[in-house]
Amino acid sequence: MATVSELCCAALNTSIGNRIAFPGSTAYNESLSSYFGVNAQLPPSCFVLPLSAQDVSVAVQTLTSQPDPCFFAIRSGGHTTSLGASAIEAGVTMDLSGMNTTTYDSSTNTAFIQPGARWGSVYETLLRDNVLVPGGRTASVGVGGYLTGGRNSFHAARVGLACLSIKGYEIVLADGEVAKVDQDSHPNLFRALKGGSNNFGIVTLFDMEAFSTEGTIWGGTVLYDISTKDQYIAAGTAFTDNIPNDPYASWVGMFAYNSTTDQTAIFTSLAYTRPVQSWPQAFSEFYAIPNITHTLRSATVLDLAVENSFPYGYRNVLQTGTYSNNAEIIQKAVIILNNQVKMAKLRARGKDYALFAIVQPWVPLFWEHSEARGGDVLGLERFETNLLNIAWDYSWDNSADDELLYELAQSAREQLDEYARSTGAYNEYIYLNYAGRTQDPLRGYGLENLEFLRRVSEKFDPDGVFQRLVRGGFKIDRA
């Protein structure tokens, strides 16, 4: 007897058969293997491989009209590490990777980007017209999940978080309607989609305001010895406070342990988004620290995004928190990381794993123009001081270590949260795109925004399709 999910796939095969991939087919295997994290490769009963908004609409109408519930997941790039957010076992996964085009209209200065595109291809297309949009700092990241979660970029200090550059959406709603959404036509839904993740529908096109690029930018990766950490941490906190004085500069700091070398080092991603020939003044304190090696040069955003790409083929977990910008928080994160390394050495069964504590500035300049652009639901306007996002990014090769690494990542974040609360440095905001499966980023947006999300969901999805049937990700009804 066929299972419910198999019956759902059979119905899809009738309504949109040329867009369905079943187990054992080449298309099915290619889709399953293309997730960033191996542990995210949950095998569905079938994949839907749409090429248009109409394909998505037919699929949604089919899935929501069956006598038994058809559970489904939605993926664009498959880069999320929150289990089940973009995949489902024994259900239906809608893989948007075939919807991957980018076009640019110079008359309106608008980039039209489909959700299955990767940021590398987006940049490659837009740079032909000497324009860009704020997007992923890693070439392989998909557009859809990135933009519906808000997202930071190389250009955040100049143009705001990436979602704020969205002028309009094409979205398939719960009843299958293909709707055009902007600040004038659907102001509440427009706002809710900026940070609302997969709670309202399936976005099939993003209309983004572009900006002119001055050609090459300057940046790359710098490697420092861990012995420089005190000077490095001081440089990072000073840089964060200085961002308003030079919004072209961006910094990501990574304290990283790799089991294959048994070494902890400091990796730094620097970018200066206008042409310069050497270290800009904004990075002077990093320049003063002796480095082991670096790749700093004049390059394109595409070049840096390719360089920043992490290898596929590993298992992965993320946890994240937000804190006041101060050196003590980063120092505590390094202490926690060192203790985590000791635990991993004692308990890990695999020999190939990496533990990263990643530090990034979050400053009011990133969100200060939100309301003028239709608003968002991130709730960051509550905060007027400079913040840090610290993410625990762990990868490993042996499935026997899954629970250990999940436990360690969560423990690291909880320990830093506890320390931050005790020192008055804790901030309730949780960056959705880095949040772990045990976290609640929607509640971190603030209760007012959470209630707003509930009202918008009730209006545009009264039957709760994207709460009940799309169970993965961070859901409003579970916040």
Curated annotation (Swiss-Prot):
Coiled coil: none
Cofactor: FAD
Ranges of residues in domain FAD-binding PCMH-type: 40-213
Family annotation (SUPFAM superfamilies): FAD-binding/transporter-associated domain-like
Documented EC number(s): 1.-.-.-
Gene: sdcF
Protein purpose: FAD-dependent monooxygenase; part of the gene cluster that mediates the biosynthesis of the polyenes aspernidgulenes. The carbon backbone of aspernidgulenes is synthesized by the HR-PKS sdgA, which accepts acetyl-CoA as the starter unit and performs malonyl-CoA extensions as well as regioselective methylation and reduction. The resulting nonaketide offloads the HR-PKS by intramolecular lactonization to yield the 5,6-dihydro-alpha-pyrone-containing hexaenoic acids preaspernidgulene A1 and A2. The FAD-dependent monooxygenase sdgC then installs the first epoxide on the penultimate double bond.
Gene Ontology MF annotations: FAD binding; oxidoreductase activity
Keywords: FAD, Flavoprotein, Oxidoreductase
EC supergroup of this enzyme: oxidoreductase
Family: Belongs to the oxygen-dependent FAD-linked oxidoreductase family.
Protein name, entry field: FAD-dependent monooxygenase sdcF
Signal peptide: none
Pfam family, one: FAD_binding_4
Keyword set includes Flavoprotein: yes
Pathway recorded for this protein: Secondary metabolite biosynthesis
Modified residues (Pros-8alpha-FAD histidine): 79
